[in-house]
Amino acid sequence: MGRSIFSFFTKKKKMAMARSISYITSTQLLPLHRRPNIAIIDVRDEERNYDGHIAGSLHYASGSFDDKISHLVQNVKDKDTLVFHCALSQVRGPTCARRLVNYLDEKKEDTGIKNIMILERGFNGWEASGKPVCRCAEVPCKGDCA
């Protein structure tokens, strides 16, 4: 009975900010990946340098992801959808996506990020299904190569 109306709305706002993570296939992502509202986040470590990457993707290695998470949020401030991947999207990609969700929920500020997704089968699945692979050395990749 001691709860104020303010605490009711504050609690409701916190619950509304909780984000979920969904999956997207390479076939679903291909026609969308160059849209200006989408950012592809590659969390592979060194293998990005020799295996190639999805054109236009941003690289935030999983090993240093926590240290650079605020930079990532700043870098994608004009995006509403983030798609995470690693080699297979079984460990590093989902882990980093969850870390971002936790970070955003802790910060409780509206970043504009509405959708956090994981690329099914990761980069290896993307490449194996014949999707375009960029092998440029540009950091960040401008996406001109595929």
UniProtKB/Swiss-Prot annotation:
The keyword Oxidoreductase applies. Its main location: nucleus. This is Dual specificity phosphatase Cdc25. Keywords: Cell cycle, Cell division, Hydrolase, Metal-binding, Mitosis, Nucleus, Oxidoreductase, Protein phosphatase, Zinc. One of its GO terms (molecular function) is metal ion binding. Belongs to the MPI phosphatase family. One of its GO terms (cellular component) is nucleus. PROSITE patterns: RHODANESE_3. Zn(2+) binds at residues 53, 134, 136, 141. It catalyses: O-phospho-L-tyrosyl-[protein] + H2O = L-tyrosyl-[protein] + phosphate; [glutaredoxin]-dithiol + arsenate + glutathione + H(+) = glutathionyl-S-S-[glutaredoxin] + arsenite + H2O. Its EC number is 3.1.3.48, 1.20.4.1. It is found in: Nucleus. The active site is at 86 (cysteine persulfide intermediate).
